[in-house]
Curated annotation (Swiss-Prot):
UniProt keyword terms in alphabetical order: Chromosome, DNA-binding, Nucleus, Telomere
Family that this chain belongs to: Belongs to the RAP1 family.
Assembly: Interacts with bqt4 and taz1. Unlike yeast does not interact with rif1.
CDD domains: rap1_myb-like, Sp_RAP1_RCT
Organism: Schizosaccharomyces pombe (strain 972 / ATCC 24843) (Fission yeast)
Name of the protein: DNA-binding protein rap1
GO cellular component, one term: meiotic spindle pole body
InterPro entries: BRCT_dom, Homeodomain-like_sf, Rap1_C_Sp, Rap1_DNA-bd, TE2IP/Rap1, TERF2IP_Myb
Biological role stated in the UniProt entry: Involved in the regulation of telomere length, clustering and has a specific role in telomere position effect (TPE). Unlike yeast, exhibits no effect in transcription regulation.
Amino acid sequence: MSFTFTKSDGSSILFAVSKNFEHIRGFKNAIDCFKGKIEFLSFDKVDPTKHDYYLVAEDERVSDLDIPKGFFERNPEFRHKMLKIAWITQCIEQGKLLPTESFEVELNQDDVNRTHDGFRKRELFTLEDEKILIDHVHKNDINRFGTKVYEELARKYPQHSLESWRQHYKYMKKRLPPVSDSDESNYCQRIIVKPYSSQKDYTQSTHEQTLSSPISKSASVSKSENKALVNNKRYSDSYFYFSKMRRISIDVDYVDEDLNLINAYLSQFGKKRSLNELCALLSRRFSNRHTFSEWRALFMHFFPFINSEGVDPAILSDRETSAMLDETSDNEVADIDDQMIERKYLFSASEPNTVKSTNRLIFSERKAYAADDSIDNTPSKVPIVNSLSDPRTNRPFFYSNPDSMYRSISNPLHLVDSQHLSPLNRKTHFNNPIGQPQFTCLDDHEKTLRETSFRSLDDMSLRKSNSDNIFVKPGEDLEIPLLSDYSDSENISEKSSDDEEAFEKQVTSSYSSPIKVKSQGKSSKGSSGLDVREHEGSDDDAEVFVDRSPESFGATKVAHTSLEGNAASHKKVEENMQQPVTKKQKKYRMVNEEAHTGPTIIIPSDNNEKVTTLPAGHVPSEEKGKFINLAMHELQNEVSILRSSVNHREVDEAIDNILRYTNSTEQQFLEAMESTGGRVRIAIAKLLSKQTS
């Protein structure tokens, strides 16, 4: 045997090993083979006079060892006798005793100071300790984010550690005023509040409120009210600081009740009182919440366009520049209104969006919609009035981006300018900066439906403005030019007259009675969707009746019939609403209506044969999709009302129109809405698909 774990005098080396090695099989036998001795025990059982070394595992932390208090102070040489277990392994592999310097466990100062109870207890900070922080850190205005200043404090004043000094100053900094570089006398005045002491000295030592603008006598704070302000202490600590011109930052602490109070007072007195008067009223009645300057900072932060100049009212109006209330009735009105405001806004959560209403009041007084945008190079904003007005303000929405129209057609209120948002939502709405309109991406299917609706805005406005002239009058003859196979009524030649162009738009609207179209030849081909019924007459002439009634227009696809015949001899189609219907025609209609209970879909044939009328159960999927798209176009106004309107009568009428259109009951519509998660469009499509299936 080449070497042994023995000393120079021949005695065996006694190792003290952590108990973590006790479960390792063969570890004790390996040391015994080389004449060493081993004991498994914790560090607090180590005897420096008896044990030669203490072995620690490679991954074992010194913080897990139970080091007795003051152990290394009494036995400083034992710091070099704590070895890693790799020393035993390397000695056995190399067959000799290796130096221990490279295998010593590194100990920092915290490990040396560690006791079996953990780190030393943190002492409580006294008033003298906080004076030290103010004199050495706060007044000097040095770099307070480093650690050198706190290291110096920990060395001079060892009652607290470096981290304790640093953390306590962070806590104090929230209540300390900023240091004035120009005038040291304007620094701060400390006020010590002694428990169970009289308030006389305390009241005399408080600073007087200084207001930046003059306040009327009715809104001034008296001495008794100032004493009440002092008695309602806002701080629970034993001391706090005041400054003459206290600057409140934007991130001042506030709660939702504070915003409700601001909104309520601004709505009630905004057009009669100035901003300073409002702040004085709030600070007098709710002195335990905020001071005058804090209320003013909250007003300026959440309502940046409020009038803060002089004694003018906070909300200026062009037509309404009423004078201040008389001093005799001012206090009485204020007391009555304050009680109402407290009950409605402060102690009740029934009005969560009160700030939004005040924002609309302030922004409505601004000339936001004036034509002042022509100076810059931004795109001009064109108002869209057709069913796109804000029901809350009765004002049209303005768009500078044409793509935003797709979103506004189905839900006009979805495109919200951040100016109309409440202060609570202004910071988080879509995570976008203030003043930029918000948009939402659409999928391909929804965008296709929106595009179809967007193209029909002109027809919607035409039907609304020319409702008196939309139907054909008795005795009036209409001439329709022949249409080709690939044309429709929306693309009539641009060379037509003004009357023809007006009729071109009217042809897409619904009529109260069917149109009788007389053409040459046997056949007439409908473009996939019009309820076209051919009269089986002679071989020379064929009469085709196009059902333009509101029932047929709502239940079938609106398409424009393509008529073919002898174009050389017949170039015009005559149409007469007054021509009586023969008995044979009525009989044909009755038979056709009995044969088809559901909506009638017309499939055009390839050759010049009769138009095939299929029942709803045999509708191809392509024609079925076109029919649903058309239905979405017709029910566009009802969908918009259900999404945005708050008028119960309008909502009821919209639901009734949808039920009549889809030929369904209220229970079926309710089940469709529940199955689609409240999405109106998908629910209507689901009801229509049941009709054609």
